[in-house]
Amino acid sequence: MQFTGIVKFYDADEGVGYIVREPDRHEILVRSSGLALGVEALYEGDRVAFDVNMGTNAQARNVMRT
């Protein structure tokens, strides 16, 4: 299932950040390994679409700007 959200924070040096999922405002962890091909970094305020790896620690994957 694909979700949308807004990047709350992303540290390109560390390769980690958070996306605020819409509409429930849940914060989802994103790592550089979860970025879609061609996306090298995210920036605060970017609107994104992504899938969620539903495990113990939910993480965004296939993250792309919209």
Predicted segment positions?
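Short aromatic-glycine-enriched beta-strand elements
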Residues: 14-19
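Structural detector for short beta-strands of small beta-barrel domains
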Residues: 1-13
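OB-fold/S1-family single-stranded nucleic acid-binding modules
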Residues: 53-66
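Short acidic, glycine-rich loop/turn motifs
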Residues: 21-23, 52
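A short macromolecule-binding patch
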Residues: 26-33
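Short acidic/polar mixed-charge low-complexity motifs
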Residues: 1, 24-26
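Short nucleic-acid-contacting surface segments enriched for D/E, G, S/T with interspersed K/R
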Residues: 36-49
